[in-house]
């Protein structure tokens, strides 16, 4: 330790003391300032291009999800059309059953009338069950498509290292901006 102190005293006496170098060219201050400005400009361009690429990717995913939604909507419309056709068939069947009931009521006895009423109500129950089944299938299909899409997007985002790095960098930049405003 004593040797280190002696070396320091020797150097300070030889150079007439310790002084601040005010020559900006010799101290490399201009070079450092230019390097800092260059790094800031390059980082801004790179970050801008990364963010614009991410934005384009997100817009593509939104368009893809919109297409899938339109497809699910189309299938839902088809199912609704089938449901309305089943209702028309049911109404037609209902009219025919009423006609049969009236014809048998006039010509047949009470037993035949009871059998037709049971057939009518069982037909209504079957139609209601089919209607509920179709609606349930459509709801399940739409929910399945939505869950598959959400799971896929979420999995890709979580697995993407660049997204995680960009999100971390973006959070740091926002925090620095927030601290700088106070």
Curated annotation (Swiss-Prot):
Keyword hit for Hydrolase: no
Subcellular location: Plastid, Chloroplast thylakoid membrane
InterPro entries to which the protein is assigned, alphabetical: ATP_synth_b/b'su_bac/chlpt
Principal cellular location given in the protein's record: plastid
Membrane topology summary: Single-pass membrane protein
Functional summary from the UniProt entry: F(1)F(0) ATP synthase produces ATP from ADP in the presence of a proton or sodium gradient. F-type ATPases consist of two structural domains, F(1) containing the extramembraneous catalytic core and F(0) containing the membrane proton channel, linked together by a central stalk and a peripheral stalk. During catalysis, ATP synthesis in the catalytic domain of F(1) is coupled via a rotary mechanism of the central stalk subunits to proton translocation. Component of the F(0) channel, it forms part of the peripheral stalk, linking F(1) to F(0).
Family recorded in the similarity comment: Belongs to the ATPase B chain family.
Note: In plastids the F-type ATPase is also known as CF(1)CF(0).
Annotated protein name in UniProt: ATP synthase subunit b, chloroplastic
Protein source organism: Heterosigma akashiwo (strain NIES-293 / 8280G21-1)
């Amino acid at each position: 330790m004593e040797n280190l102190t002696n070396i320091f005293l020797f150097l300070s006496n030889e150079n007439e003391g310790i002084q601040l170098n005010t020559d900006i060219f010799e101290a490399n201050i201009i070079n450092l300032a230019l390097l800092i400005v260059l790094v800031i400009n390059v980082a801004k361009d790179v970050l801008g291009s990364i963010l614009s690429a991410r934005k384009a990717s997100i817009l593509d995913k939104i368009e893809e999800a919109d297409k899938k939604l339109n497809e699910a909507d189309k299938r839902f419309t088809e199912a609704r059309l089938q449901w309305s056709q089943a209702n028309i068939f049911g109404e037609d069947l209902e009219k025919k059953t009423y006609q049969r009931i009236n014809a048998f009521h006039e010509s047949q006895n009470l037993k035949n009338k009871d059998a037709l009423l049971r057939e009518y109500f069982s037909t209504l129950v079957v139609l209601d069950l089919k209607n509920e089944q179709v609606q349930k299938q459509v709801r399940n299909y739409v929910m399945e498509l939505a869950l598959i899409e959400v799971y896929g997007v979420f999995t890709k985002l979580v697995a993407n290292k660049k997204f995680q790095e960009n999100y971390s960098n973006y959070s740091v930049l926002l925090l620095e901006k927030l601290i700088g405003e106070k």
